[in-house]
Amino acid sequence: ASTTLTPVSEGDDPAIAVASEAKPAAAADLSTAGAAFGEETLDWMHFSDNGASPVSRANGTAINSVRFDAGRGFSDYVALSWNDGDTEASNSGSTNGTCTPGSITISVIVTPDTKHILLYTGAWKGTNTVEVYSQGGSLIHTAQSFSGDNTSNRQLVTLNVDAEESGVLVIKINLSNEWDDGSNVSLAALAVTGNSAGTAADAD
C-alpha cells in the first residue's frame, strides 16, 4: 500500500512526500540498501542478537538516536546482512531484532541529499502505526497502519524525504489494539539512503 501526501511547509523542516509499505524480501543487504533507488547508503543500524547492543554502519552520521520504551529480542525477521558495520564488521544474514510492548522513537538527521528512510518493522498481536514529526513536534505524516495476529506481520516501510535544508525528523513506531500482554511492535533495522555530498571529492 502507498500513501501520497502533499509536502507540508514548515519553514526549514523537511517534509515527507510519500510513504509506502511492502512485504520485505526474504533477504536484504543493509550496506547496499540505497542501490534499489540508484542511491548510496548513508547510514544504517541493526538491532541484532536478541537484545544485544545494536550494530551501526561504520562512520554513519544520519541516525541520531533510537529508543525503545522497553525492549526484548526476537529472531524471526527476514535475513539482513551487512559488510561495513562498526562493532560487528559483517554478517551474512541476521534474522534478529528488538520488539517492545510500547513505542519506538527514532531521530534522524536529514539534509537535501537525504532521499529515503527504510524501516524494517513489524507487529505481533497488535497494530503498528508509523508517525513522522518535525523537530519542532509537528506531525508531518502518518503511514498506513498494519496489524499482526499470531503470526508476525513484517513490513518494509519506506519514507521518501524532501528536505530543502538540513533538519531532524522524529519517527515514532506506535503499538495499538493490543491482544494481550505479549503484543508488540518491532524494529529489526533501519537505513538512510541518498546522495553522498562527498562523493565527487572522494573520487578525485
Positions of PLM-derived features:
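Non-catalytic accessory regions used for complex assembly or targeting
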Residues: 11-27, 46-51, 55, 103, ...
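Surface-exposed, low-complexity/disordered Ser/Thr/Gly/Pro/Asn-rich loops and linkers
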Residues: 61-107
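Boundary/junction segments of secreted and surface-exposed precursor proteins
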Residues: 2-51, 197-204
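Generic recognition of flexible, low-complexity loop/linker segments
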Residues: 104-108, 118, 158-159
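Contiguous ligand/interfacial binding patches
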Residues: 99, 122-195
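Extended extracellular/luminal ectodomain segments enriched in beta-structured repeat modules
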Residues: 110-118, 166
